[in-house]
Amino acid sequence: MALEDRCSPQSAPSPPHHHHSSQSPTSTTTVTMATASPVPACTTTTTTTSTSGASAASSPTRDEMSLVVPISPLHIKQEPLGSDGPMPAQPPHHHQHPHHHQLPHHPHHQHHPQQQPSPQTSPPASISFSITNILSDRFGKATAEQQQQPHPQPPAIREPISPGPIHPAVLLPYPQHVLHPAHHPALLHPAYHTGLHHYYQPSPSHPQPIVPQPQRASLERRDSLFRPYDISKSPRLCSSNGSSSATPLPLHPYHTDSDCSTQDSTSAPSPATYGDIASPSSASSAMTTPVTTSSPTGSVYDYSRKASALDHRAALLNGFSAAASYPKLHEEIINPPQVPGEADRIANEGGTGCGGHGCCGGSATPHNMPPLGSLCKTVSQIGQHVAGTGSLNGSGSAANGASNGGSGAPATAKPTPKPIPKPAPSSETNGSSSQDAGMESSDDAKSETSSTKDGSENGSNLWPAWVYCTRYSDRPSSGPRYRRTKQPKEKGDSEEKRPRTAFSNAQLQRLKNEFNENRYLTEKRRQTLSAELGLNEAQIKIWFQNKRAKIKKSSSEKNPLALQLMAQGLYNHSTVPLTKEEEELEMRMNGQIP
C-alpha cells in the first residue's frame, strides 16, 4: 500500500460507473522516474494485493507504514490517461527517460518538466488513507473528475511529483540533514500537507497527482525538500521564488487559488533545486537548474523548520512582498474567509507535530477539509508572522495559531497593521467643535481649529502635533492663518474705537518738515511738537512711524529673509498691497510666469 502509486490522484474510491475500473487485481508497476542520476531504478515494485508486498530498494519502512492505514486486499485498477485505454503495466526498465517531452504542452502543467505522468493506479473499491489523499480537497472526487475529462496526453509514466516522496535517485545527497518522520516534525508539518493540496488543486482539465506521504521515510538519507511546502508555500518566501533561487526558469502565472505553489517547480528553492526533481531526463534538469544551486534558502528551508539550520533572516532578506508577488494569496491572508468549524477542529485534533492534520498515521480517517481558502490562510500565515521566532517545530500549533490563536508566539499576529492613532481622536466626531481635549494642549492648535475653515475640515484633516508648531502659512491646514478673536475688554471702549485723527494742513506741513529734518523723534522734540500742534505725543509718534513705513514700502527695501520667504510663496502676511515688482517676482518664483 505504501508503494501504491505515490503520485496518482486517483487514490480515492472510484465511482462505480467508471467505465475503466477493472475490478480484477491487476498488478501494475509503479515506476518512478529519476533524473539522470546513476542510482538504479529503486522503486519499480509491482504492488500486488498485499499491503506490505515485496518492495525493492525503497520498501516502506515502519515509519511509512505507521503513516498509512493498511488495507488488506488492495485492488489496483489501471486508470486511463486518455482515449488510449488502460495503460499497460510499464516494465521496470522503462525507467530511463522515455517520456521527457510529453507534458510540456499541457496547459495546466505549465511546462514544469517535473510533472510527468506515471501509471495512475488506484484501488477501485478500497480507499487509500494516505494522508495526502485524506487532506486533499479532491478526496473522493479525483476519479470522477478524471472520468469526465479524459487526459489529452498519451499514457506515460507519471513521476513522483516533487511533494515530499521524491525518489532517492532523483535527489542530490544532503547527508547532514536526516529526514526521519519519527523525530523530524517538519515532515509532519501541516504546511506540508496543505501545501500539497494547493500544489495539486484540481484543475479542470486533469487531476494533478497527489503523492502520499508514506514514502517519505525511505528517503531519509537524501535531502527531500518536499516541494509542496517548499519555499513558495512559506509566505515568508513567497517572493523568494524568483529572487533567491538560482533557477533560471520563468515564473509562471498562477492558476489556482493562491498559487504560490504552482511556481514551486520553476524557481525551486531546494538545495537540489527542484527545477527537475522528477524530470525524466538529465538534460532538462541540467538545463533548468544547476545541480547544487547556490540558493541560500534552499538548504535553510528543506525542512522548513530545522532549528539548527534555519536562519530566519534569510527569508526576510530575500525580500518577501506577498502583496506584490501573489496578490490573491495576500488578499486571502488579509481577508481570511472564515470557515466556522475549522478553528475548533484544528484545535481539537492538534497534536504537537502533526498539527491535527491527520499526518501522524494514527488519525487516518478522512477529515472534512474546509475549502482551500482558509487552509491556505492558515498555512500562509505560519511563516509570515512567526518569522522572528525560534523554530516552528510545534508546526501544528503554528497552523492552529493562525486560525484560532492556539499557538503562543506571533502566529496570531494581526495580518493588517493598526492605523496610527490620529492626534485628536475626539475631533473626528466633533467636527467643527474644535475645542476638544486632544487639541487643548496646544494653544496654536486651538487657534487653528477654532477658525471657521479649519473647524469644518477638522474631522478629515488631522495632522500630527508638530505640524502646528510651525509658524509659516504653508502648514497642511492650508489657507491663511486666523488669529483668535480677542475677547472685548469692558474698560477700554474709548481706546478701542478712537476715531481716526484728522490732521489739519498746518499740522501736516509742520510734521513733514520735522520728518524731513530727522525721521526719528527724540522725546524732547516730541514734547515740543505736541505743545505746538495741540496733539497727543502718541499721535505724533504714530504719525512718524507710519511715515517711515510708507517710505520703506515704496522704496521696496524688504528684509532679505522676507523676500526669500515671499519667493517661496511662504510670506503672504503683507498688510500693504504688493507693488508690481513684488507681484511679478512672487508669480515668477511660484512658476505662474515663465
Curated annotation (Swiss-Prot):
Residue ranges the UniProt entry marks as DNA-binding: 496-555
Gene Ontology MF terms in the entry: DNA-binding transcription factor activity, RNA polymerase II-specific; RNA polymerase II cis-regulatory region sequence-specific DNA binding
SMART domains xref list: HOX
Name this protein carries in UniProt: Segmentation polarity homeobox protein engrailed
Location relative to the cell: Nucleus
PROSITE patterns: ENGRAILED (PS00033), HOMEOBOX_1 (PS00027), HOMEOBOX_2 (PS50071)
Protein family per UniProt: Belongs to the engrailed homeobox family.
Biased composition, class Basic residues, residue ranges: 92-112
Biological classification of the source: Eukaryota, Metazoa, Ecdysozoa, Arthropoda, Hexapoda
Native organism: Anopheles gambiae (African malaria mosquito)
Residue stretches of biased makeup (Basic and acidic residues): 487-499
Function: This protein specifies the body segmentation pattern. It is required for the development of the central nervous system. Transcriptional regulator that repress activated promoters.
Listed Polar residues bias regions: 237-247, 426-436, 448-458
The encoding gene: en
Pfam family, one: Engrail_1_C_sig
Segments of skewed composition (Pro residues): 151-164
Record's compositionally biased regions (Low complexity): 22-60, 278-299, 387-402
InterPro entries: Engrailed_Homeobox_TFs, HD, HD_engrailed, HD_metazoa, Homeobox-engrailed_C-terminal, Homeobox-engrailed_CS, Homeobox_CS, Homeodomain-like_sf
Keywords, in A-Z order: Developmental protein, DNA-binding, Homeobox, Nucleus, Segmentation polarity protein
Annotated stretches, region: Disordered: 1-64, 76-127, 141-164, 198-217, 231-299, 387-458, 474-501
UniProt key word DNA-binding: yes
GO CC annotation terms, alphabetical: nucleus
Entry annotated with the keyword Nucleotide-binding: no
Gene Ontology process terms (BP): cell differentiation; nervous system development; regulation of transcription by RNA polymerase II; segment polarity determination
